[in-house]
Amino acid sequence: MKRLVLLALTVAAVGRLSAQTAVERVTTDLKYLADDRREGRGLGTAGLDSAGQYIAQQFARIGLTPAGPGGFFQPFTVDSTAPMALHMHIAGVHTRNVVGLIPGAGRLAGQVIVIGAHYDHLGYGGPFALDPESTGVVHNGADDNASGTTAVMEIARRLAQRHAANARTIVFVTFSGEEEGLLGSTYYAKHPVRPLDSTYAMINLDMVGRLAGRKLTIFGTATAREFPALLDSITTRDDMPFTGSGDGYGASDQETFYADSIPVLFFFSGMHPDYHKSTDDWQKIDFPGLVHIAEVASDVAWRLATRTGPLTLVEVPRPRSAMGGEGYGAYLGTIPDMSESPGGVRLSGVTPGSPAAQAGLQGGDILVQLGDQTIKNLYDMTDALRAHKPGEAVVVVYLRDGKRMETKATLGKRGG
């Protein structure tokens, strides 16, 4: 009996040590990526190149096989025909994805699981920043998306230790140019390191650093019929409550793969007031929560890598682009709840001091109309903002506790 007690205590201690080590690892990784010296990982900066070099070094230490034409790097140049190339003055910029893989085994080795995250951010602000007063200040993007990049590295460490007689090849890729219109994932889809038609599923991690007691959101749960049951079994075992949400479209890199008829999952810990602001710093990251998400994503990835049956793709038409290559439009300062909200856009909060805050909007409100535009989803909301200019006063219609209300907001100007 004494020996059993000692064994149990030893196992518990090892578990605690392992968990602590993981927290230390992700803290080190994320703090490097979100350091001021990375220059906000803006496209074309030396800071972004430095971040890519760090990721490649970690891939090498983990033991991944280099998968790009330049070792771990997949370089590309932003084409002038890219949707936002001219608007953002980025045509001709040289950048690179970082790609490594774990070779598969047995009869499943020819199929591929892609696990990805974008590692770029806004640099020193610009037209997509939501704090116009901070243009020229480093936007470190700790949550967006140093957190997802860090999670990809941690998942790679975990999966590199797993083995099976039959397993799909697992490709890990961190994408550049996501903020400018999914440039890195689009380039990868056109130049995959393994044939795209052999890709079984894609897992994307974007903004996974602010769990802090909230439910994880997993988008794309309806892109394969088998996903809901698979996710329920793993998240229940791993004690990770989650909210499943819809198709595979949305403003992150999984959209590129879903548009190519690949089932996708997108892990997301939620919006917050620091989104696309210079205040998105490492001190606000929930590191134990980030480790927990990486653990769950690892288990999901391994189940997908080793299951024998096919996935049944569920396709829906691609919605119109919410960007159209012209930016987001005037500034309101709402923080949308990215989970589905039929009949409008539910807010998780508003930015203090913003036009939305001054108009009395608050978290939990559901926006249903902006000016003359009916709002059913985020695409409608973006279109409505693009239809107005900074300084215009618009009527905002919203639901609060089921009651239809309206207010007037004077729209502001975005950074740039």
Residue ranges of predicted features:
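Sec-dependent N-terminal signal peptides
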Residues: 4-12
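Mature N-terminal segment immediately following signal peptide/propeptide cleavage
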Residues: 20-44, 48, 52
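Second-shell loop/turn segments in exported
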Residues: 36-46, 85-89, 133-145, 161, ...
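A non-catalytic alpha/beta surface segment that caps or lines the substrate-entry region
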Residues: 41-103
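Alpha-helical metal-binding/catalytic segments enriched in His/Glu/Asp
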Residues: 98-100, 109-111, 115-121, 125-182, ...
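Metal-dependent peptidase/peptidase-like ectodomains
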Residues: 107, 175-272, 286-290
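His/Asp/Glu-rich mid-to-C-terminal helical/loop segments that flank catalytic regions of hydrolases
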Residues: 273-317
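C-terminal recognition in membrane/secretory proteostasis and scaffolding
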Residues: 307-416
